[in-house]
Amino acid sequence: MNDLKPFVAKVAAREALSREDARAAFEIIMSGAATPSQIGGFLMALRVRGETVDEIVGAVGAMRARMLPVEAPEDAIDIVGTGGDGAGTYNISTLASLIVAGAGVPVAKHGNRALSSKSGTADALSCLGVKLDIGPEAIARCIREAGVGFMFAQQHHSAMRHVGPTRVELGTRTIFNLLGPLSNPAGVKRQLVGVFAPQWVDPLAEVLRDLGSESIWVVHGEGLDEITTTGVTKVAELKDGKIRSFELTPESFGLARTTLDALKGGDGAHNAAALQAVLDGEENAYRDISLANAAASLMIAGRATDLAEGMAIGREALSSGAAKAALQRLITVSNAA
């Protein structure tokens, strides 16, 4: 079948799709066979009714089947947020990725330009001088030689061109905000995944377990798709096939609480300058929240045994200049492609 309308009708009637039906529906969308109106109607019907674990697993299957893969070490990690939280913060996962890479853990970062915020990872990295339009072999070289590589979602999920304009016109989060972090082209088994709403923490951990991930934290921090330093972060940890739920506070990391205003960013150039300032030694709320996310990532990767050790390793990566050097290597290697 090459017609999305029956699936639109089913979801509009508040029926859940099986994994097979969800995969079939997303195959139709990503093949270009659906119209923008059908795609918009389908995405919003899913959102209003609420996407199920099976629907997400099926959709990810369709995404992964069409993506352009990248080779990365077995122990590589991705630090990624769904976006769509509407908070307009600095590029926290981007800075955390550079800290983790500076600590010696390979990072295969998957991200995009901003859709529902002023600056996505790609916007900030582009302003810093990282070349984004490079092929899979060049990205693999970045991961090997720089310790960090950036996979620009549009290049690895070319079928997304069929939904991009509709997503921009809708201007709100859809299931695709959930699918991006679950469709890393390097096939990483270790991830820190931030989600835009607390109700998605546990379901996404289930999805990632069903998809074969090994060591995962899915987090939401008081309105942020990150571990937050403003209050409580809800966490679902996937390890050894089991899911454990718990909460963290800034005090869990030995950090003082901050306000959301202190974390507000701007456009790509503004956020790039703020990121560079932290790498150059500035201490502020942006540094603290990025260190917290890096510390958790170092635990997920098995590099740190607890958050205190993760914070110490992260601070050393900054103070020694190792995180800054990781960015410089990424700029150099990506531009040599």
Swiss-Prot record:
Organism: Sinorhizobium fredii (strain NBRC 101917 / NGR234)
One of the GO BP terms on file: L-tryptophan biosynthetic process
InterPro entries from the UniProt entry: Anthranilate_Pribosyl_Tfrase, Glycosyl_Trfase_fam3, Glycosyl_Trfase_fam3_N_dom, Glycosyl_Trfase_fam3_N_dom_sf, Nuc_phospho_transferase
Keywords noted in UniProt: Amino-acid biosynthesis, Aromatic amino acid biosynthesis, Glycosyltransferase, Magnesium, Metal-binding, Transferase, Tryptophan biosynthesis
Cofactor(s) listed: Mg(2+)
Gene3D superfamilies named in the record: Nucleoside phosphorylase/phosphoribosyltransferase catalytic domain, Transferase, Pyrimidine Nucleoside Phosphorylase, Chain C
SUPFAM superfamilies: Nucleoside phosphorylase/phosphoribosyltransferase catalytic domain, Nucleoside phosphorylase/phosphoribosyltransferase N-terminal domain
UniProt name for this protein: Anthranilate phosphoribosyltransferase
